């Protein structure tokens, strides 16, 4: 299973790399799809704490928190690497890690290419092909999620 290809999606947004990075991180609650939440109660707020070691979690309407992962690399405004600690059963596991790398590359004075790569999918074992299919889905995977980000970045 070590040959499971990463999922890679990208979008070009009409803003600076600095602003794109800020919207992706500090502004995650403005664009993260509400249905992308593994908590028992609906998602009220999505949080990405700045800096290496910062938590990535959702706050449910009932007040409970639901971890997604943590910040592994924080290099504003060009690069962010997050630990995605969601198992194939869509549950948080502190001992399970795949990586999501996000890069912000200027393509002009106010144009930035944002690339998301979700890798280490072989760690899902036999569930890897199905999990990869889910996070690569045009109706719910990383492309869909980046579409939400792009709408906010265009404002």
Where are these regions (language model features)?
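Hydrophobic pocket/interface hotspot
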Residues: 20-24, 56, 71, 82, ...
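Short, highly charged C-terminal tails/helix-capping segments
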Residues: 40, 150-155
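Tryptophan-centric aromatic hotspots in well-structured domains and transmembrane helices
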Residues: 31-32, 74, 84, 121, ...
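Hydrophobic-ligand binding "helix-grip"
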Residues: 46-47, 61-111
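Short beta-edge strand/loop motif at the mouth of beta-sheet-based domains
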Residues: 27-68
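Intrinsic-disorder/low-complexity, polar/charged segments enriched in Ser/Thr/Lys/Arg/Asp/Glu/Gln
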Residues: 4-12, 55, 66, 79, ...
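Beta-strand/loop substructures that line and gate deep hydrophobic ligand-binding cavities in soluble
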Residues: 89-140
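Hydrophobic ligand-binding cavity/cleft-lining segments
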Residues: 1-43
């Amino acid at each position: 299973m070590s040959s499971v290809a990463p999922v890679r999606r990208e979008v070009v947004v009409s803003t600076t790399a600095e602003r794109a990075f800020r919207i992706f991180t500090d502004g995650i609650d403005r664009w993260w799809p509400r249905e992308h939440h593994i908590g028992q109660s609906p998602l009220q707020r999505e949080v990405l704490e700045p800096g290496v070691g910062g938590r990535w979690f959702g706050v449910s309407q009932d007040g409970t928190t639901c971890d997604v992962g943590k910040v592994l690399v924080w290099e504003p405004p060009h690069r962010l690497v997050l630990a995605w600690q969601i198992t194939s059963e869509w549950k948080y596991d502190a001992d399970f890690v795949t990586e999501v790398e996000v890069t912000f590359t200027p393509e002009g004075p106010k144009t930035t290419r944002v690339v998301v790569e979700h890798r280490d999918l072989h760690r899902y074992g036999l569930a890897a092909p199905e999990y990869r299919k889910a996070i690569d889905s045009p109706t719910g995977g990383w492309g869909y999620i980046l579409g939400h980000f792009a709408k906010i970045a265009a404002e």
